[in-house]
Regions:
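FAD-binding subdomain of flavoenzyme oxidoreductases
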Residues: 153-298
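Residue-level detector of anion-binding/catalytic polar loops
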Residues: 120-121, 186
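Short, basic and Ser/Thr-rich N-terminal targeting/leader segments
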Residues: 116-118, 125, 197, 221
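N-terminal flexible segment immediately upstream of the FAD-binding catalytic core
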Residues: 1-113, 131-163
Length: 298
């Protein structure tokens, strides 16, 4: 996946709809709903005006931070329908003041320390596919910093014997699979947002995947988690399994970035399938389809 992300919609700028495609869509909608529908122009970053940043990062952080219009607009919203509509209309009323792109865990620590010292809102940002306002700065609040983990995107270690991999949290789904593939492995977690969502985001939101008839949620793959908190770096103990009391990982899974910024995790991986096949089936009723799916799964 190469190219710059669209600041207003899903995908890359190079894949934005052409004028002809937009007009065709408007014509179909007009016919379908019996009223005139016009296609709005594709938003241009040159037309976006944001409020001035309310804070400035210290010199030690400026190498990997920015307050450019594109970066702030892109990190203003997730990708829910409401988010896209506001972005198309150019309604960026509450953008983050600074966007940080830390390249190491130490830079994540330094950024979070600055946020604490300066009383700033820190917002972890993975792939930006949130549909519940998880990456949106709170209204009427303090200056905010969006901490984008996209530079932390590597598979650091593979334990082939135990079938586990140590993976940085900012890696997106396709890049993760690309790095596991040469070793004969796959994570086999494919949420709908797979193309533009990150491992850290999957863990923080307790992601569920499409191919989920066996391992339903990301929970099933997590061996241990490492994250930066306001009190320092925290890491759960990596174990093949444990029955000793509550699992600390369960506290992190689904925490939505409220407890800290996930930087890496040990994940259970699987061997890549030798054969793959797919088929489509039709049923006479919803109930018949439901019953068939239930029998297959059970």
């Amino acid at each position: 996946m190469t190219g710059r992300r669209s600041f207003w919609g899903w995908g890359l700028e190079k894949d934005e709809p052409t004028n002809e495609q937009r007009q065709e869509t408007a014509a179909r909608l007009s016919k379908r709903f019996g009223r005139e529908v016009t296609a709005p122009p594709v938003p241009r970053i040159e037309d976006v005006t944001l409020r001035a940043p309310r804070t400035t990062p210290p010199a030690s952080l400026r190498e990997f931070t920015t307050s450019e219009t594109y970066d702030r607009a892109w990190h203003s919203y997730g990708r829910s329908f409401r988010d896209v509509i506001r972005a198309v209309r150019g309604q960026f009323d509450n953008p983050p003041d600074v966007v940080a792109y830390p390249r190491t865990e130490a830079e994540v620590v330094a950024t979070l320390e600055w946020c604490g010292e300066a009383n700033l809102t820190a917002i972890p940002y993975g792939g930006g596919s949130s549909v519940v306002a998880g990456v949106e700065p709170p209204e009427g609040g303090r200056p905010s910093v969006s901490i984008d983990l996209s530079k932390l995107d590597q598979v650091l270690e593979i334990d082939a014997t135990s079938r586990a991999a140590r993976i940085q949290a900012g890696v997106l789904g396709p890049a993760l699979e690309d790095q596991l593939r040469p070793h004969g492995f796959t994570l086999r977690h494919f949420p709908q947002s797979f193309e533009f969502s990150s491992l850290g985001g999957w863990i923080a939101t307790r992601s569920g995947g499409h191919y989920a008839t066996n391992h339903t949620h990301i929970d099933d793959f997590v061996e241990s988690v490492r994250m930066v908190t306001p009190k320092g770096v925290w890491e759960s103990r990596r174990l093949p399994g444990s029955g000793a009391g509550p699992s600390p990982d369960r506290m992190i899974l689904g925490s939505e970035g409220t407890l800290g910024i996930i930087t890496e995790a040990w994940m259970r991986i699987q061997g890549r399938p030798v054969f793959r096949a797919s088929a489509g089936l039709t049923f006479d009723s919803w109930q018949a389809g439901y019953e068939a799916a239930r029998h297959v799964v059970q």
